[in-house]
Design a protein with these regions (language model features):
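Short hydrophobic/aromatic-enriched beta-strand-loop microsegments
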Residues: 69-72, 155-163, 233-240
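A short acidic, amphipathic alpha-helical/loop segment
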Residues: 58-62, 148-149, 172-176, 201
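Glycine/proline-rich, positively charged
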Residues: 26, 36, 79-172, 178-185
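Conserved, mostly hydrophobic/aromatic
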Residues: 6, 18, 46, 59, ...
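N-terminal binding-site loop/beta-alpha segment at the start of enzyme catalytic domains
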Residues: 1-70
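Structured C-terminal cap/extension of enzyme domains
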Residues: 37-39, 43-44, 170-252
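A cross-family glycoside hydrolase active-site/sugar-binding cleft signature
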Residues: 17-19, 47-49, 73-75, 103-106, ...
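Short glycine-enriched loops at secondary-structure junctions
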Residues: 22-24, 51-54, 78, 140-144, ...
Length: 252
């Protein structure tokens, strides 16, 4: 499997990452088992959020002893600076670490920037100076906000929905990130469950050498599907191209 460099973050990881939102639905033992097997199977990038109830705690339980071998991205949906300070403090405690590799504004309604009056971006920079945050990222669902964030040059990573059901504007966003050496993290690479063929989903993503997909995983059988891609990486062929085109016709 391809190793990708996530923009200018210094993060190099297999193009196959763990989305930890669903493990909040698992009991501790199940979650720890799945997370540990993901790491042992070769996954090194784990994405979570303060909003995902106990997801961060489960990552801390499962992976704190291999912290230096993995990359952790988490998120804050804080509405003000004081709340963001509390969020980061709680996240670090839950994750059993003193830093996160990427700290992301969660579902940002706008492009936070220095001097915008909120003080939010300046606080992120302060976290970074203190060594608690290594890279500043942002996640959003609105393409216009995403484009503004990329064009601003303020962020190390962009997390945005991206799958083979995405349109040309989303593909252009990926290209913009590549041009600016900005990491692109693909959420919802299964289009919120509309895509059922994991090989077709992966084969589409594999065409983009700057895109890191995060797969939401809560069952071991799901994990084993994605780990199978480590050894036998799906590439777009006639069969998978047919599945992709059929889904596009049906679901567009």
């Amino acid at each position: 499997m391809r190793q990708i460099a996530l923009g200018k973050t210094g993060i190099v990881t297999p193009q196959n990452a763990f989305g930890a939102l669903p493990v909040q639905r698992c009991d501790d033992d199940t979650a720890v088992n799945i997370l540990r097997k993901a790491y042992e199977g070769g996954m090194t990038f784990f994405d979570t959020a303060r909003a995902y109830s106990d997801s961060e705690k489960k990552i801390g339980l499962a992976l704190s002893d291999v912290r230096k071998e993995i990359f952790i991205a988490t998120k804050t949906g804080a509405k003000d600076k004081e709340e963001m300070k509390r969020h980061l403090e709680t996240s670090l405690e839950n994750l059993k670490t003193d830093y996160v590799d990427i700290y992301q504004f969660h579902l940002a309604p706008r492009c936070f920037a220095p001097g915008d009056g909120s003080g939010m971006y300046e606080l992120m920079e302060d976290f970074k100076r203190q060594g608690m945050v290594r890279n500043i990222g942002i996640t959003c669902h609105k393409i216009g906000v995403a484009e503004e964030c990329v064009e601003s040059g303020l962020y190390a990573t962009m997390q945005f929905p991206f799958s083979y059901l995405s349109g040309e504007r989303e593909k252009k966003l990926v290209a913009m990130c590549k041009e600016r050496d900005m990491g692109f993290i693909a959420m919802k690479a299964l289009a919120g469950g509309l895509i059922s063929n994991f090989k077709a989903a992966y084969a589409f993503i594999e065409q983009f050498d700057n895109v890191l997909p995060i797969w939401g995983i809560q069952r071991e059988e799901e994990l084993m599907q994605w780990l199978s891609c480590m050894e036998d990486t799906p590439a777009k062929n006639e069969e998978l191209a047919g599945i992709i085109e059929a889904d596009r016709r049906e679901l567009d």
